[in-house]
Amino acid sequence: HTGEKGRRGSSHKSARPVYDSWFVRVNDVSDLWNNQPTYIISQAIYVVGGLLTLLHALSKGGRWPYFWVGILLHGIVADNFWTIVVPEFDNFWHSQTPIIFLGGRLPLHIILLYPVFIYNAAYAVSKLNLPKYAEPFAVGLVTVLIDIPYDIVAVKFVHWVWHDTDPNIFDRHYWVPWNSYYFHATFSASFFYLFHATRRYLAPKVPQWTAAGWRSEFFSLVISSAMGMFGGVLLFVPIYHPLHDMYNIHSEVTFFLLFALYSVFILQGLLSDRPKNKDRLTAFDYLLLLQLIVHYLAYWCFVMFMHPEKEVSVGFHQPVGPCGEKESLVTPFGQTLYKNKYLCASNYDEKYYDFRCVGGKIPPNGSKWYTICGTPFENRAEYITVISAILILAFGVFRAFYFKNVEIIPPLIVKKKNK
């Protein structure tokens, strides 16, 4: 698959596969860098960050290594269940990467992205010593806080594309479906809850982050990894589906209703009597914080200095086909919703990509693998302001979690005896 000459004067072509099979494809990095430099930088951050969280988990011991493995498996299930098991709900396509799995649909860095998000959130929340009822909700919202700059900036730089007309992701925030934030809040909270609730049932007398017998840890890991996604889906049922599907309420409203409910539980937990954190920060703790700083600053630098219109994605995207052909989705309440089965390449509403870098030539019907081109910022200053605001909030939140809930032990004063 080759693309026409791009606006930077070089040929935008598919990455040359070094190794190619359905399970894993290894692509030439130089081709990918030429097409999408910000994507390569983003991937490197999550690969390194995922390995750092693993090293941190091993250094902490106890249940943290089990938790890390559980997150990894939970992410694989959550990111691929819809593509493989329920393809009618398949609604996003990653750009190609140096190492990508499952027929070119699962990049390596996405596997490690989930530990970067959820592990960092859970470890930061653990320092607050919140009551058990508040912890999953806090982990959910902190996961969203880590995710937001990634979601907003990466899609603008065509690191992936969304389905154009899927009703579940139709309502957007800077081209990010509001349900993406809802997804991260509910799936991470569900996984965290099941990981600990299962172990509390199997070994009720063992402290939360202390490892029990291998059977208890194995079953809690398997149950949370396999069922965390389904718990997250269930949390869509009481709020999102009735309000959005039955009453046509915008997904922004349903997300902020979820946010309000989470916040109430978290606030009650914060105002409860709870012990201060007595653990001193280790070198690995500071590495986690450094990794978060790099994560946030990378996306700030992208919107400040980089140009999305120079990013070109050659690979799998939404299949192109007849503009009027529909397919149906059935909601948990039995309603039938409809979406276009194919991308109508001559009439679509995803303004973060177009076909200008290939001379405006749209892909023919039947295309699944084709070239798309990033588009310029409509207002770069607005993106800079939004990401800056998120960075300010994240700085305050993580500083408070790590440094403001610490028990201060006064220095021991030794009185001298008078002779």
Report each predicted region and the residues it spans.
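Aromatic-rich, lipid-facing transmembrane alpha helices and their immediate juxtamembrane interface loops
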Residues: 1-419
